UniProtKB/Swiss-Prot annotation:
It holds the Pfam family Caveolin. InterPro entries: Caveolin. Monomer or homodimer. Interacts with CAV1; the interaction forms a stable heterooligomeric complex that is required for targeting to lipid rafts and for caveolae formation. Tyrosine phosphorylated forms do not form heterooligomers with the Tyr-19-phosphorylated form existing as a monomer or dimer, and the Tyr-27-form as a monomer only. Interacts (tyrosine phosphorylated form) with the SH2 domain-containing proteins, RASA1, NCK1 and SRC. Interacts (tyrosine phosphorylated form) with INSR, the interaction (Tyr-27-phosphorylated form) is increased on insulin stimulation. GO terms for molecular function: D1 dopamine receptor binding; molecular adaptor activity; protein kinase binding. Residues 1-86, 108-162 are cytoplasmic. It comes from the Eukaryota. The modification Phosphotyrosine is found at residues 19, 27. May act as a scaffolding protein within caveolar membranes. Interacts directly with G-protein alpha subunits and can functionally regulate their activity. Acts as an accessory protein in conjunction with CAV1 in targeting to lipid rafts and driving caveolae formation. The Ser-36 phosphorylated form has a role in modulating mitosis in endothelial cells. Positive regulator of cellular mitogenesis of the MAPK signaling pathway. Required for the insulin-stimulated nuclear translocation and activation of MAPK1 and STAT3, and the subsequent regulation of cell cycle progression. Keywords: Cell membrane, Cytoplasm, Golgi apparatus, Membrane, Nucleus, Phosphoprotein. The keyword Nucleus applies. This is Caveolin-2. One of its GO terms (cellular component) is caveola. Residues 87-107 dip into the membrane without crossing it.
Amino acid sequence: MGLETEKADVQLFMDDDSYSHHSGLEYADPEKFADSGQDRDPHRLNSHLKLGFEDVVAEPVTTHSFDKVWICSHALFEISKYVMYKFLTVFLAIPLAFLAGILFATLSCLHIWIIMPFVKTCLMVLPSVQTIWKSVTDAIIAPLCTSIGRSFSSVSLQLSQD
């Protein structure tokens, strides 16, 4: 049907006086964004979602429906996929983008301001902790284990048969 390849052509025309020249901001060239052939998935994150009618509904050679049924079902599939996608994106895209932005901003903030300083602090303190742990081991644990070992080494068992 070709509906999945059609792109919406949206253009915004403004007079030069509509721009506020007093703000000191440089605006991007509108011609740069007027390209309707823009690739919205440059890293191919969702290449697995490019399904056609033949990928979902397939009739073997031995069982074919009427040609009109096949054509109408193909048209209905493409139209419903196109319309439902547009409908769902109108109502879900903006709220989900907002929530994803909040989530990623929160995770970035936690990573930058809490997790990485904590990790760096631990890595910075570890040599001191290692030195203290070695001293504690040499002063307390090693003599304790040595004395327990000597105590158990003097234990002997003798078996007698009576």
